[in-house]
């Protein structure tokens, strides 16, 4: 930007007071030389800074100043400007002084309506200033060097898919012709000479921009206020805003006639003008006149030097404000009326819906009144037919049909009515007459169907029920208690407890019909006292009817209610067993039905106190004689195996049987016996015990002890003569018996593991062992023991495994451990203990 002109005023002279001021206004010279790289700059010298305007410059007469201004030529003729009002744009352009046009145009000196008018240019503009100072070559030959090349750019584009004559892009959406440029006529700003759109732009984008439309509309409306230069009186065209457009726009002016209370009380200080003004609502700001402030004119409104001030031709701000206010008030009134109309229409729709609802309510109420009238007629008809002298008395079946009709057709009214009082007045007399001659023990199912029907008609549902024994809330419960219960109470007082079957059958037939609290009342208040009294009178030594025959049938109905009877029963049975001998099997027949009735603890205590001592005495009297054995006493004891626990039975055998049995075996072996007979005798006694008893560790130890005694006998060479093959037979017997024991143990362990897996205890169902090897593997994982096969090692065709530090093999569900000389079978638990 040029700096030399910054030291001169608008006429090109220096100001004494402002010689040190730098003016940064943009001049025409700056605009013309904006892109001129060769423009000359003048830098202020030290002499110019010291002497200011009195400094001598050699180049004052040689080159023009950068400000584009020349000194006035006083030898030129004087041009006079005629006074008067503002003329047309063309005349004003001719009368303007050429010197004024050469002055730099300041930003604040542009006319207010600058835009569509042309820039005023004079004839004194230097032709040399139409181009840059340094000058540049024309662009006509730009790119002419390419004509001597081989067109590599065009070839590259064609390789990438470009087709000549079509646009760029994947879908050829680019423009074909280059963008055309339109040269502006003068030196004004953009838009100063009208539209600058080219022919290509009009073809590609025929739609007119909204800003251009607004400008055209503004010029059209503005021209209506101007006088036609031709003098013809043409009727002006006005554009109107219809009511529909105003409604569609829905604009609500902020200038409300009745502002909100909290907004109207806001204090607003307006400091936009020369003076501070205070308003007490926002609406007052919008109501103020748009009148220019009376003060010094703006810099843009000051007359230019050498020109007269031009007064505005037509300015009535008060009238314009009033007209605008009337327009806005009218728009507000239209919008408010439209809203009020919409509100009234919505109110009409709402009232129509309310009318429909009220009509439905009225119809419902009329229907309810009609139904209540019909229900009342039916009830009155029932009361009339219940009178003593009626020719057509009401029966229970007809009454049930009437109640069914009430429940089916008039369900809401039936639910809302007082069914208790209705049933008491109508149903109860008929029900009493129906059960008048009923005997429950002879015909236990009499009346079950009719009572079941009345249960569905009279019993309250869960929402209306007030409790199990609230007779005032449930008509059916009251019916059973007041009509049915007296007949049952009367028959129970005459009933004999030893004849329990009719009473049990009667209650089983009615247990699903009568209420639960009534059944509890019958069992607790009527049946149990009778049973308790009968148990006190029972004598097990004299009564021929077993007590369980008339007590146990009550178990499904009474269950834990019979617990108080068990203690006196056990006491009476214990007293009866004081002189009992195991040879009498009647005791077992009397006690066996009570095994599952008494609790396990009480049953075991009863057996240990009253039965086990008798069995011990009987077993102590047993004489073991291999040549002539009497087994009656042994059978009497073994017959109680299911009645007493296994531990109690094993205790009896350890104390009273095995000592004598082992003593007889030792005596037999010391007298040169026949080992085949001993083997048969051993196996015969072992077959007398069940698998459950043989699996007990104490019993196994005793039989293993007998095998050890026999092995020592055949190995000690006692006597001069030894039966041939006796040693081998005893060894084979020992091996076979131990093998059976371990097979049984393995089977038991496998069953326990399967049961645990089925119950969900322990391992998951997917990991349940399918064979004995899987079971051993599972146990090894549980105890963190290494279990793996020994590669290339077998014994009798069986794979050898290492279980920790022990070598084992599995044969038909039995684990064999490698001993010092032979393979010894062992149990799984023993194997785990040895591995640890």
Swiss-Prot record:
GO cellular component assignments: catalytic step 2 spliceosome; chromosome, telomeric region; cytoplasm; extracellular matrix; nuclear speck; nucleolus; spliceosomal complex; U2-type post-mRNA release spliceosomal complex
Task: From the UniProt entry, list the residue stretches annotated as the region Required for interaction with DHX15.
Answer: 1-50
The transmembrane segments are none
In terms of InterPro entries, this protein maps to: G_patch_dom, GCFC_dom, STIP/TFIP11_N, TFP11, TFP11/STIP/Ntr1
Amino acid composition bias (Acidic residues), ranges on this chain:
14-28, 91-102
Could you list this entry's UniProt keywords, alphabetically sorted: Biomineralization, Cytoplasm, mRNA processing, mRNA splicing, Nucleus, Phosphoprotein, Spliceosome
Region described as Disordered:
1-31, 54-73, 85-136, 183-236
Bias class Basic and acidic residues marks the residues at 1-13, 54-64, 103-116, 217-231
Chief location: cytoplasm
Q: Which Pfam families match?
A: G-patch, GCFC, TIP_N
One GO biological process term is: negative regulation of protein-containing complex assembly
Instruction: Give GO terms: molecular function aspect only.
Output: nucleic acid binding
Task: Please give the superkingdom of this protein's source.
Answer: Eukaryota
Motif interval(s): Nuclear localization signal: 699-704
- As stated in the Swiss-Prot or TrEMBL entry, residues carrying the post-translational modification Phosphoserine are 2, 59, 98, 144, 210
Give me the ranges of the annotated region Required for nuclear speckle localization: 709-733
Give the subcellular location.
Cytoplasm; Nucleus
Q: Which residues form the G-patch domain?
A: 149-195
Q: Family assignment?
A: Belongs to the TFP11/STIP family.
User: What does it do?
Assistant: Involved in pre-mRNA splicing, specifically in spliceosome disassembly during late-stage splicing events. Intron turnover seems to proceed through reactions in two lariat-intron associated complexes termed Intron Large (IL) and Intron Small (IS). In cooperation with DHX15 seems to mediate the transition of the U2, U5 and U6 snRNP-containing IL complex to the snRNP-free IS complex leading to efficient debranching and turnover of excised introns. May play a role in the differentiation of ameloblasts and odontoblasts or in the forming of the enamel extracellular matrix.
Q: How does it assemble?
A: Identified in the spliceosome C complex. Found in the Intron Large (IL) complex, a post-mRNA release spliceosomal complex containing the excised intron, U2, U5 and U6 snRNPs, and splicing factors. Interacts with TUFT1. Interacts with DHX15; indicative for a recruitment of DHX15 to the IL complex. Interacts with GCFC2.
Q: Which PANTHER family match?
A: TUFTELIN-INTERACTING PROTEIN 11, TUFTELIN-INTERACTING PROTEIN 11-RELATED
Entry protein name: Tuftelin-interacting protein 11
Q: Identify the species of origin.
A: Sus scrofa
Query: Gene symbol?
Result: TFIP11
